[in-house]
Regions:
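Bacterial N-terminal signal peptides that target proteins for export
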Residues: 1-8
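Gly-Asp-aromatic-enriched flexible segments
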Residues: 21-155
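Bacterial Sec-dependent signal peptides at the C-terminal "C-region" and cleavage site
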Residues: 10-23
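N-terminal start and proteolytic maturation junction detector
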Residues: 4, 13-15, 52
Length: 155
C-alpha cells in the first residue's frame, strides 16, 4: 500500500490511500533531540523559555519553540504531500528589536522563506508542496542583527 505524509500546522499527517484512513502525528510528538539550535533547548508545545507559544498576539497549543540559528531534519522518503505552519518570533521577546528568517528546504532546494520577520509581527503562513521530497529541513536563521532573543516558533 502506498502511503503519503502531509505536514499540516506543523503536523505530520500520514494518509493511507489503500484503506482510506488517515493518521495524524504532530511534529511535537516526534523525537527532537537531533534538532540543533544556537541557544537553549527546543521546547515541545512551548516557547524556548517554556511559555505558551504566542506570535503576534495569537496563541498556539501545538508546535515547537526554538532559538536561531536552528535546524531540524526530517526523513520523508518521498512520502510527503505538503507542509503547512504558522511561524514567527514569540511575543515573549517583543520588547527586543530582534529578527529572524524561517526557511524550508527540501532535498537541498529552498522551498519557502518567510523573509525577515520581526518581534511583534503577525504569524506568517508557510504552505509548501512536498511531492517526492525525501529530506525536509526546517531552519531558523538570524535576521541580520545577531541571534540575540531570536525566540522562534513553528506552530
Amino acid at each position: 500500500m502506498k502511503q503519503f505524509l502531509a505536514l499540516v500546522g506543523f503536523v505530520i499527517a500520514s494518509i493511507t490511500t489503500g484503506c482510506g484512513q488517515s493518521h495524524t502525528v504532530w511534529l511535537d510528538d516526534l523525537d527532537l533531540t537531533a534538532m540543533t539550535q544556537g541557544n537553549g533547548v527546543a521546547m515541545k508545545n512551548k516557547s524556548v523559555d517554556g511559555k505558551t507559544l504566542t506570535i503576534g498576539g495569537q496563541t498556539f497549543e501545538r508546535g515547537v519553540g526554538t532559538h536561531s540559528v536552528s535546524e531540524i531534519a526530517i526523513q520523508l522518503d518521498g512520502k510527503a504531500v505538503s507542509f503547512t505552519a504558522q511561524v514567527g518570533l514569540d511575543d515573549e521577546i517583543i520588547e527586543h528589536k530582534t529578527s529572524a528568517e524561517f526557511i524550508v528546504i527540501g532535498d537541498g532546494a529552498r522551498l519557502w522563506s518567510s523573509g525577515i520577520v520581526k518581534a511583534g509581527d503577525a504569524p506568517k503562513l508557510c504552505s509548501v508542496s512536498l511531492d517526492g521530497v525525501k529530506r525536509l529541513e526546517l531552519i531558523v536563521a538570524d535576521g541580520g542583527d545577531g541571534p540575540y532573543y531570536d525566540h522562534a516558533d513553528w506552530a
